[in-house]
């Protein structure tokens, strides 16, 4: 009212007096309204006369009214509320008013942030509590409804439904609170905070400009004062103009003084102009500062008012929302209490008894009597499974009894009734642990009979099985797992529970619980079975060995001329399903999958399953294997010779790699260089070139010509020495050599028939079978079965007279009758006996010479036998992957014994015992005679080998100089 009266025009004295009277009456009415007693009542009502609950309610209402009145009613003596203009004017006139307004806005934002955090945390707690109550109510409702005819069952069902409805209401309330309270208040807080920072930045900028203007004004004022003082000093110190009769020297001095005075006057005028400009700038900045101050104060006030309005609105909405939620609970509980009042105890029990069907009364129980002992002679132990032949008790003789007696019910319950306490507690044999030794006690326990293995499941005792190994076949036919997805390679193993800590062959991590194969003893995590790449070889898996980044001659092989199994497996898989794939050997595979394949080769060697991998990953593994060899396929000491030959190809236009008929000199020179390669290097290079020849033959499909393959494999097969010998090699020479390398490899691919011979093109070996019954035949990357290899082992020892295609060798043998002494016949018989024994011992590992085995070997690669096979765990360990000493001895014997040349076909490029410079007739195909692949040293074998060595020496002396012309023709 005071603020309203100040804005009105002055009234007459009488009117002013009436307004004071009205104001006094209003104050009196307000003061009388705050009094808590009724003047019309007799005695005031005492608090003790009220009921306890009503007294408490009255106290709460009185306190709330007093607090609300203190917040709502203002005392007449208190300050009147200020208008918006007065608020802004007071802040403007107060020193630091703008900073105070901005600080209040910051405090308001912090206050709103605390409110939001508190409400959000409270809502989260309520949400978790409501979910827990609903979950508990659901479980309790299911448990209560399972019982029938229980007291107050309907009431408690309503109670649980009430909890569910209250929980749903709480969830809805929390969601609505976040939508109606949290989001608007948070948005307003962010808006206020953003504008506060903007206003603060503007205020700081204006203050900085004002300070700069004031400093410039002070500097210009000081400069102006100094210039004026200088001008006054020079004007006062100069004398009056002398007469014209003065000397010329005095005239110069006067002229100098005059110029100095003019300069001082000009500087004074300049300083004065600068000073006036700074004054104007300072006044302008001060006006801008005042304008900014008014604007910032006004906007801050509006932002605070808007924030208060939003806070008031969302708070009212929150209280209404919470009030509606809280009102529902008391009403529901009061309704439940009203429903519970008319319940009579024992009412449900009476209903339960009425539901029973009363029948005829049971006959009275017979009295028990004493029976004397009667001796019974038995000629054999009594069989408890037979029917009892003695006199039955009276109770058992009654077959028409309507219901059993109580002792019969007890006996039946002890045997196990569905739903009885025995099953619930876990007294059944099925509920006990399968690994416990006492899980199957007595003769009545379940015993699993061992069955012959089918290659998929273990036939060990039931106690040794993993609980995860079950009967389910959800993950594939024959899969022993219910939870884990098995890879194709994992399905070939016979898995069982791991019996001790071991190292996983797949991830190279130690484990305590896992799986183990019964035959190859491969250990693996259960989760790693999904990505396992190692097939079961049905014999103990050899230890892990490094294959990448090692010397070429140190790679595991069974005989000197064998191609490394990494190369044979990769090329066989590519030729089986990816010869026509576009970009083969040019597109790189995934780095992660390539690493896994390399690790699988080092862990499982030749037993790696490649059918499920991308062809680009397989080619990347092959290229990486060749690149990381410390000594490449073409040795370092022959690198210069091959590069020189490649340069001659490049120099002669007629010897271009694409020329269909190259010059015979180039072919002869290249064959001479190839003869100098070691045995394994030659076989590997020939195998790789044959594979690339097949790839280039399908150029129209895969877009990989011989030129492209030469670019890919040139720097891999031919590498310059990287040791001290290569210190003088320049980068330019290496760059030029790369072109020659690619050209030479292209030449080898294009002219494979003229260089190696088309009739001896190595056949593409079949990929490793996934059938567990055929897996032993593929062990250790052997291209043949062990039995056939054993038969081949005996051929060099028995000289193989019948297999020689050349009649000249028969004539040479006829000239030397000492070639077949009686000891040699004994040796042949012993070798045959050892062959038969080894074939019988390893019947499951390979094929034999019988017609049935030959027919089985001629079947398709997808054929497998279902006949169960029992493999022994303690079998012979696999051959160590080193250069076999016995194989080297046999190779040496073959080199020293000219008679073994009969086993070599006509037209071979390399002959054992001849030097590397041996030449062959032009156009003859290049062939090699594979040495025995596997030997098993025993005392008897060593004795026979020593005797064979002595016989070979005697034969050498006997056939010292056969006909030279015939041998040259044969070569």
From Swiss-Prot:
InterPro entries, per the entry: AH/BAR_dom_sf, C1-like_sf, F_BAR, GMIP/FCHO2-like_FCH, PE/DAG-bd, Rho_GTPase_activation_prot, RhoGAP, RhoGAP_dom
Zinc finger intervals, Phorbol-ester/DAG-type: 492-536
Residues annotated as domain Rho-GAP: 553-756
Ranges of Polar residues composition bias in the record: 59-69
Region listing for Disordered, in residue ranges: 41-79, 231-267, 383-476, 799-865
Ranges for domain F-BAR: 85-348
Pfam families for this protein: GMIP-like_FCH, RhoGAP
Residue numbers of Phosphoserine PTMs: 19, 75, 235, 238, 247, 436, 440, 884, 908, 924
Residues that bear Phosphothreonine: 659
GO molecular function: GTPase activator activity; zinc ion binding
Gene Ontology process terms (BP): regulation of small GTPase mediated signal transduction; small GTPase-mediated signal transduction
Keyword field: Coiled coil, GTPase activation, Metal-binding, Phosphoprotein, Zinc, Zinc-finger
Annotated GO CC locations: cytosol; nucleoplasm; plasma membrane
Signal peptide start-end: none
Site (Arginine finger): 586
Quaternary context: Interacts with GEM through its N-terminal.
Biological role stated in the UniProt entry: Stimulates, in vitro and in vivo, the GTPase activity of RhoA.
The name this protein goes by in its record: GEM-interacting protein
Annotated gene: Gmip
């Amino acid at each position: 009212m005071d603020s309203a009266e100040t804005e009105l025009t002055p009234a007459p004295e009488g009117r002013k007096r009436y307004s004071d009277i009205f104001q006094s009456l209003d104050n009196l009415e307000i003061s009388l309204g705050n009094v808590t007693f009724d003047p019309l009542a007799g005695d005031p009502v005492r608090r003790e006369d009220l009921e306890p609950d009503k007294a408490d309610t009255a106290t709460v209402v009185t306190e709330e009214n007093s607090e609300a009145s203190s917040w709502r009613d203002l005392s007449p003596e208190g300050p009147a509320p200020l208008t918006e203009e007065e608020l802004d004017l007071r802040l403007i006139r107060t020193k630091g008013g703008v900073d105070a307004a901005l600080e209040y806005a910051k405090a308001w934002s912090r206050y709103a942030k605390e409110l939001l955090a508190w409400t959000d945390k409270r809502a989260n707690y309520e949400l978790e509590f409501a979910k827990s109550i609903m979950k508990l109510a659901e479980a309790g409702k299911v448990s209560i409804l399972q019982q029938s005819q229980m007291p107050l069952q309907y009431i408690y069902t309503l109670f649980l439904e009430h909890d569910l409805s209250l929980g749903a209401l709480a969830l809805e309330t929390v969601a609505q609170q976040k939508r109606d309270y949290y989001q608007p208040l948070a948005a307003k807080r962010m808006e206020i905070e953003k504008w506060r920072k903007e206003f603060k930045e503007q205020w700081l900028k204006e203050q900085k400009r004002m300070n700069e203007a004031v400093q410039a004004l002070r500097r210009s004022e000081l400069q102006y004062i100094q210039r004026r003082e200088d001008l006054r000093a020079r004007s006062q110190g100069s004398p009056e103009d002398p007469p014209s009769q003065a000397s010329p020297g005095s005239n110069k001095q006067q002229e100098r003084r005059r110029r100095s005075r003019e300069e001082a006057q000009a500087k004074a005028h300049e300083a004065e102009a600068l000073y006036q400009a700074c004054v104007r700038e300072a006044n302008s900045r001060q006006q801008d500062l005042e304008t900014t101050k008014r604007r910032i104060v006004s906007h801050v006030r509006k932002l605070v008012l808007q924030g208060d309005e939003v806070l008031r609105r969302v708070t009212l909405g929150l209280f209404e929302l919470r009030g509606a939620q809280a009102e529902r609970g008391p009403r529901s509980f009061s309704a439940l209490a009203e429903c519970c009042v008319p319940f009579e105890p024992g009412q449900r029990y009476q209903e339960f008894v009425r539901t029973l069907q009363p029948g005829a009364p049971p006959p009275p129980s017979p009295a028990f009597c004493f029976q004397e002992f009667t001796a019974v002679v038995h000629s054999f132990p009594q069989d408890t499974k037979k029917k009892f032949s003695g006199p039955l008790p009276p109770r058992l003789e009654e077959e028409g009894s309507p219901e059993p007696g109580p002792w019969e019910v007890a006996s039946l319950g002890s045997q196990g009734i569905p739903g009885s306490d025995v099953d619930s507690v876990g007294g059944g044999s099925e509920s006990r642990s399968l690994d416990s030794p006492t899980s199957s006690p007595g003769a009545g326990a379940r015993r699993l009979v061992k069955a012959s293995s089918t290659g998929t499941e273990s036939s060990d005792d039931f106690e040794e099985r993993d609980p995860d190994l079950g009967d389910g076949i959800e993950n594939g036919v024959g899969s022993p797992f219910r939870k884990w997805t098995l890879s194709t390679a994992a399905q070939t193993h016979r898995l069982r529970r791991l019996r001790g800590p071991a190292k996983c062959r797949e991830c190279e991590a130690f484990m305590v619980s896992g799986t183990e194969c019964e035959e190859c003893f491969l250990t693996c995590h259960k989760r790693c079975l999904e990505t396992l790449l190692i097939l079961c070889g049905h014999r103990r898996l050899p230890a892990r060995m490094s294959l990448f980044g090692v010397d070429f001659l140190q790679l595991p092989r069974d005989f000197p001329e064998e191609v490394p199994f990494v190369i044979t497996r990769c090329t066989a898989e590519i030729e089986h399903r990816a010869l026509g794939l576009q970009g083969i050997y040019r597109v790189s595979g995934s780095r992660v999958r390539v690493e896994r394949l390399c690790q699988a080769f080092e862990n499982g060697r030749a037993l790696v399953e490649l059918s499920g991998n991308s062809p680009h990953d397989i080619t990347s593994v092959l290229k990486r294997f060749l690149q990381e060899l410390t000594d490449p396929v073409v040795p370092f000491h022959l690198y210069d010779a091959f590069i020189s030959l490649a340069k001659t190809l490049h120099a002669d236009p007629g010897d271009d790699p694409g020329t269909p008929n190259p010059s015979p000199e180039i072919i002869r020179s290249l064959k001479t260089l190839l003869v100098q390669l070691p045995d394994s290097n030659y076989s590997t290079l020939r195998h790789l070139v044959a594979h690339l020849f097949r790839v280039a033959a399908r150029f129209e499909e895969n877009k990989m010509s011989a030129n492209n393959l030469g670019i890919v494999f040139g720097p891999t097969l031919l590498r310059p020495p990287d040791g001290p010998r290569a210190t003088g090699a320049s980068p330019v020479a290496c760059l030029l050599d790369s072109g020659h390398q690619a050209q030479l490899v292209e030449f080898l691919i294009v002219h494979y028939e003229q260089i190696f011979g088309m009739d001896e093109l190595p056949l593409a070996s079949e990929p490793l079978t996934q059938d567990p019954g055929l897996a032993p035949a593929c062990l250790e990357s052997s291209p043949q079965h062990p039995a056939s290899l054993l038969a081949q082992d005996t051929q060099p020892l028995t000289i193989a007279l019948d297999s020689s295609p050349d009649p000249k060798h028969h004539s040479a043998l006829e000239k030397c009758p000492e070639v077949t002494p009686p000891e040699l016949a004994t040796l042949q018989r012993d070798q045959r006996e050892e062959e038969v024994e080894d074939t019988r011992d390893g019947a499951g590992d390979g094929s034999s010479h019988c017609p049935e085995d030959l027919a089985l070997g001629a079947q398709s690669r997808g054929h497998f036998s279902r006949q169960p096979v029992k493999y022994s765990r303690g079998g012979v360990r696999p051959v160590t992957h080193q250069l076999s000493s016995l194989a080297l001895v046999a190779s040496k014997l073959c080199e020293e014994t000219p008679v073994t040349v009969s086993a070599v076909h006509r037209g071979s490029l390399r002959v054992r015992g001849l030097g590397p410079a041996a030449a062959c007739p032009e156009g003859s195909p290049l062939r090699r005679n594979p040495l025995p692949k596997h030997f098993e040293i025993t005392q008897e074998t060593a004795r026979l080998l020593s005797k064979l060595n002595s016989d070979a020496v005697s034969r050498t002396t006997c056939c010292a100089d056969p006909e030279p012309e015939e041998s040259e023709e044969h070569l």
